[in-house]
From Swiss-Prot:
PTM field: The reversible ADP-ribosylation of Arg-98 inactivates the nitrogenase reductase and regulates nitrogenase activity.
Upper classification of the organism: Archaea, Methanobacteriati, Methanobacteriota, Stenosarchaea group, Methanomicrobia
Binding site for ATP: 8-15
The encoding gene: nifH
Swiss-Prot/TrEMBL catalytic activity: N2 + 8 reduced [2Fe-2S]-[ferredoxin] + 16 ATP + 16 H2O = H2 + 8 oxidized [2Fe-2S]-[ferredoxin] + 2 NH4(+) + 16 ADP + 16 phosphate + 6 H(+)
Keywords: 4Fe-4S, ADP-ribosylation, ATP-binding, Iron, Iron-sulfur, Metal-binding, Nitrogen fixation, Nucleotide-binding, Oxidoreductase
Molecular-function GO term, any one: ATP binding
Name recorded for this polypeptide: Nitrogenase iron protein
HAMAP family registered for this protein in UniProt: NifH
Modified residues (ADP-ribosylarginine): 98
PROSITE patterns, per the entry: NIFH_FRXC_1 (PS00746), NIFH_FRXC_2 (PS00692), NIFH_FRXC_3 (PS51026)
Amino acid sequence: MRQIAIYGKGGIGKSTTTQNLTAALATMGNKILLVGCDPKADSTRMLLGGLNQKTVLDTLRSEGDEGVNLDVVVQPGFGNIKCVESGGPEPGVGCAGRGIITSIGLLENLGAYTEDLDYVFYDVLGDVVCGGFAMPIREGKAKEIYIVASGELMAIYAANNICKGLAKFAKGGARLGGIICNSRNVDGERELLEAFAKKLGSQLIHFVPRDNIVQRAEINRKTVIDFDPESNQAKEYLTLASNVQNNTKLVVPTPLPMEELEAMMVEFGIVEL
């Protein structure tokens, strides 16, 4: 069982990428559990045809410990992917990071991590790797980390910060598998992210081009893999899935000092002096 966490700054398309990646892996015959670790609870929506899933924390609040069972919090989605949303605290109360810790602990106790699973994916809110959101890394749950980024300053800044957290908790066994580019059609984007990944000691695992079919699929509450499996974009996600499946390059990243990061952005014309 490979346990993989997907990080990336808010709004980068992390949940969209994760759902299309897991859908592609499922069509390749893999058995998958996807745990959404974002208080917005939107990590599984397209796999469930738009169904707003009841979260682990909502169930805990309304039913108590006794009311939480796998039938309530685990829903089968596209490709028979087991879908879970950890949820978050009520707005303004409590810590969402603690919620992830509670949810994963509950899933373990309830026996969600069955031996027949090929993959467990964690879709994690990742602008800031605070203690709770770092939990899949820190506790050694996820051994493989992929970061979704684009050729924009804040996306790369967030990716570098995530690598700082990953390097700090490397003793738990977590390693960076690579950078996934979710393209924003920025000039020189592929070359920039290849250079950034190389400086980290890692790789650009795949460059996912921008295509409006992603939005059309989302409007229809489906992944691209489900909505139009013959499309070019579906083939891109299948290539990403194949690259992840065959990836053996797992490293402790070397985050860039801020001066070097800014110099690289200037070199590629993303930032002007």
